[in-house]
Amino acid sequence: MSGFETVSARMEAMLQVSVQAPVEDVERIMAAVSALDPLIMAAYDSNAFQTAGGIERYRPREGAAAGAESEVRKRPNVVQVGFHLPKDQGLLERVIEAIFQVHSYQEPLITLQDVLVSRSKGLDDKDNPHRWWNTTGDWKKATA
């Protein structure tokens, strides 16, 4: 599928990178990724999504750093972090290598997927009641 445009958005071809990791690894992984690519989306950077923690299941086999075990391990608080990168092979190789260097696992699980991602055309939404900046949420600056 190729990119396309609507009145409000452009759909751009990118790579979605997903990494499974213990929650305590996430800041280190994202710092390494952000040092190579700022993960920019319009007027924002450091754009990524982190799932809630889940349970990872695995059994170390011969050759594993922990040595072979007979029981399946169940590790809590493993999350998935996803972000988008341009389709640049050199950048992708550097990002994958950086993740491998800072991840705590012997075999980090990293998946790649071709995706189309939306990019706003920057429409004037100052009167749109559905935009957070036009509501009274706690993120609005307090008036004196």
Question: Predicted segments — roles?
Answer:
Residues 1-144:
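Hydrophobic structural segments
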